[in-house]
């Protein structure tokens, strides 16, 4: 599968909206897609493309502005990634962020050196020149730093806009050429004045207009789906989550009965979910859903399997086998619709720049069910109208299409379902234990009116047994882990500081109502270093 996020601009989604386009040249930063998200929050379309994109290609795209991302390299590494130096002569406003600022300085004749002391985390930023880029930013504010190199000498024509105690040159500008740089990360939530700075660049310097709206996206996505699909039939694997449900509503509005949704019940969903899903789509919204009970097939694939990556692969491969068999029975179909999102692509094919070779290298985190299991000879053509959206944007689109709030606000749920929330081998007994524990978690979170405050809240079953005492009897049973996190987009997350009495109620109910469990623990790990899911 081609990941256009990190290569050339995606002209299939947002083509008309790209008249107000900000492009981000990605130098391997973990925050590149977050920059895009922040710009979209200002209602301007933004995409991440390769740092190797030439000035000529950029000129053809005609973006309103260019942002150079941060990155893990030093500009003086032998094979440090370099942008085309001709971009400085395009006359397009450019903002360099961290490594991007250092690269700007180096290529334009300034000096970058290893800092005496690196700067990481929150730092007080002092504004020296509150001109266009820093308009409406407090004279003293907090920004997020992450750099070991620093600019020590400016290129001709540049001036200093801001400093910190450890970094004398923390923001720079050449207003006549509309070239700007910041040593900090304005896109990170910890940067107090970051959003104001980004808005200044987008609106005051790049002169953009707010055209990236939910209504505009829906209108254009429907138009593009109709143009691509024509009178052909489309098959969609419906999971009941916000992504596939939003996609189903969008496609149904675009092509009506040309869409067939297939719900494959692998046996790894939460308690009562298959029944609720079918009732909602078939009876309430009259969208055709073909139900396939494949529980035994999937469970048979996992007998004796304990490795999480092997679980994902087997589930993904079996899903495709079932999907292809059923599609032949129901077909023919020309297109397969997928609800691939930005975070899916980011986590499945994260990239860094190898300082020794200068080449991109994949940093494998884990396979995502919806992007990692497709065979090379897939006979469907793909339709992925949501692939450039972040989760919060998908929710906005779903809401605008009339999707019920119970689905719009549904917590993210992995494609392999409870199979990757059971560590070790998946068995019918363990599935039943986890379903019952998970139901209690959801009931109590809703009763406490905290469901919408959390990004995810779920239970994990561990493959070990612990000693306990219940009544006068010694027990030897499973522990359950509670995993509650807060997040904006799933790219980073923090463990949720929920009330102790809520945790106590959940723990008491689980150990008393779920046979086979005698211990409940709470996970207080953030992402990074951990991931949200345990597998």
UniProtKB/Swiss-Prot annotation:
**Reaction(s) the record says it catalyses:** XMP + L-glutamine + ATP + H2O = GMP + L-glutamate + AMP + diphosphate + 2 H(+)
Q: Where is the active site?
A: 98, 185, 187
Superkingdom, natural source: Bacteria
Task: Name the EC number(s).
Answer: 6.3.5.2
What residues does ATP bind to? 239-245
All copies of domain Glutamine amidotransferase type-1, residue ranges? 21-211
The keyword Isomerase is annotated on this UniProt entry: no
Example GO molecular function: ATP binding
Q: What is this protein called?
A: GMP synthase [glutamine-hydrolyzing]
Q: Which organism is it from?
A: Thermosynechococcus vestitus (strain NIES-2133 / IAM M-273 / BP-1)
Name of encoding gene: guaA
């Amino acid at each position: 599968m081609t990941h256009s996020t990190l290569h050339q601009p995606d002209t299939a989604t947002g083509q008309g909206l790209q008249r107000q386009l900000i492009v981000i040249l990605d130098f391997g930063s973990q925050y590149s897609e977050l920059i895009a998200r922040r710009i979209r929050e200002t209602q301007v379309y933004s995409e991440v493309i390769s740092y190797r994109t030439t000035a000529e290609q950029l000129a053809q795209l005609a973006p309103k502005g260019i942002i150079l991302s941060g990155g893990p390299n030093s500009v003086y590494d032998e094979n440090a990634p370099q942008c085309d130096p001709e971009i400085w002569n395009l006359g397009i406003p450019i903002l360099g962020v961290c490594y991007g600022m250092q690269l700007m300085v180096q290529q334009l004749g300034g000096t970058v050196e290893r800092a005496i002391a690196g700067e990481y985390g929150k730092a007080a930023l002092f504004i020296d020149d509150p001109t266009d880029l820093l308009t409406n930013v407090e004279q003293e504010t907090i920004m997020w730093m992450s750099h070991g190199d620093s600019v020590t000498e400016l290129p001709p024509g540049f001036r200093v806009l801001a400093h910190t105690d450890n970094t004398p040159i923390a923001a720079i500008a050449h207003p006549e050429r509309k070239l700007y740089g910041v040593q900090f990360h304005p896109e990170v939530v910890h940067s107090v004045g970051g959003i104001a700075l980004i808005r200044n660049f987008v609106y005051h310097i790049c002169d953009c207009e707010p055209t990236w709206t939910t209504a505009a996206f829906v209108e254009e996505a429907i138009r593009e789906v109709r143009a691509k699909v024509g009178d052909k039939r489309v098959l969609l694997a419906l999971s009941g989550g916000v992504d596939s449900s939003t996609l189903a509503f969008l496609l149904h509005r675009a092509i009506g009965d040309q869409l067939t949704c297939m719900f494959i019940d692998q046996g790894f969903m939460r308690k009562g979910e298959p029944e609720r899903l079918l009732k909602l789509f078939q009876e309430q919204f009259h969208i055709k859903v073909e139900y396939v009970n494949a529980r035994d097939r999937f469970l048979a694939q996992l007998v004796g399997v304990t490795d999480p990556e092997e679980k994902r692969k087997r589930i993904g491969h079996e899903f495709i086998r079932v999907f292809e068999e059923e599609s032949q029975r129901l077909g023919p179909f020309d297109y397969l619709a997928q609800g691939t999102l930005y975070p899916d692509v980011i986590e499945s094919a994260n990239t860094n720049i190898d300082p020794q070779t200068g080449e991109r290298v994949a940093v494998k985190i884990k396979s995502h069910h919806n992007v990692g299991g497709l065979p090379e000879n897939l006979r469907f053509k793909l339709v992925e109208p949501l692939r450039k959206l972040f989760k919060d944007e998908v929710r906005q689109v779903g809401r605008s299409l009339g999707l019920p709030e119970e689905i719009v606000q549904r917590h993210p749920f992995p494609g392999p379902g409870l199979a990757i929330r059971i560590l070790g081998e998946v068995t019918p007994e363990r599935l039943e234990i986890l379903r019952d524990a998970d139901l209690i978690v959801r009931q109590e979170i809703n009763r406490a009116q905290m469901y919408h405050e959390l990004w995810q809240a779920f239970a994990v079953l561990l493959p070990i047994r612990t000693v306990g005492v219940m009544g006068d009897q010694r027990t030897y049973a499973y522990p359950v882990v509670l995993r509650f996190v807060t997040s904006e987009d799933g790219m980073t997350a923090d463990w949720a500081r929920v009330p102790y009495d809520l945790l106590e109620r959940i723990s008491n109910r689980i150990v008393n109502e779920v046979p086979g469990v005698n211990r409940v623990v709470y996970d207080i790990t953030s992402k990074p270093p951990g991931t949200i899911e345990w597998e």
